[in-house]
Each structure stands twice: as C-alpha cells, then as structure tokens.
Swiss-Prot record:
Coiled coil: none
Organism: Salmonella paratyphi B (strain ATCC BAA-1250 / SPB7)
Protein name: UPF0235 protein YggU
HAMAP family, per database record: UPF0235
Alphabetical list of PANTHER family matching this protein: UPF0235 PROTEIN C15ORF40 (PTHR13420:SF7)
Lineage: Bacteria, Pseudomonadati, Pseudomonadota, Gammaproteobacteria, Enterobacterales
NCBIfam families xref list: DUF167 family protein (TIGR00251), PRK05090.1 (NF003466)
C-alpha cells in the first residue's frame, strides 16, 4: 500500500508522526509513509488531537471528518480524510 490512497469517500494516508517538533508541517515521504511533524507532546492523546486539528486545517475539513483508523498509540498511523475540500501540494504530489 502506498503512502496516499484514494478511496470512494476521500483519502487514506499512512503517516509517520514526529511529536514535539518545533513547528507543524507535512515534511514529505519517509519510507512508504508521509512524515508529519507536530508540536504537541505524545502524552494523553494530545498528539492525536493536535494531529486531527492540523490535518483538518490542511485539508479544510472538520475534525470529525478525520478518522485515525490504525495506530492510535504509536507513531505509525493510518488516517482517513473524508471528502477533503483541498489537498495540500505535498500530498497532491504523492497521489499522481
């Protein structure tokens, strides 16, 4: 499975999360996953909620339209984004 996969109702992303980064950003490809740096620490689900908020802004969707399918407690996650309104250039380059 590739890092970004289209499905009938949106996108499925395989992510590698770097918590406690200096700023939030989509870094790029990291092996067969997309590396995302976030500023939140990996404590009590803070990183997951921060990740959904960040991805919501990037894809212009509500937080409820971002579902962490796998990897709730790890750095390797599979995230589904339902009906994205826009696709960031870093992700769009990987879908082609």
């Amino acid at each position: 499975m590739s890092a970004v996969t289209r499905c009938e109702d949106g996108l499925v992303l395989r992510l590698y999360i770097q918590p406690k980064a200096s700023r939030d950003s989509i870094v790029g490809l990291h092996g067969d996953e997309v590396k995302v740096a976030i500023t939140a620490p990996p404590v009590d689900g803070q990183a997951n909620s921060h990740l959904t908020k960040f991805l919501g802004k990037q894809f212009r969707v509500a937080k409820s339209q971002i579902v962490i399918e796998k990897g709730e407690l790890g750095r390797h996650k599979q995230v589904k984004i339902i009906h994205p309104q826009q696709i960031p250039p870093e992700i769009a380059a990987l879908t082609e």
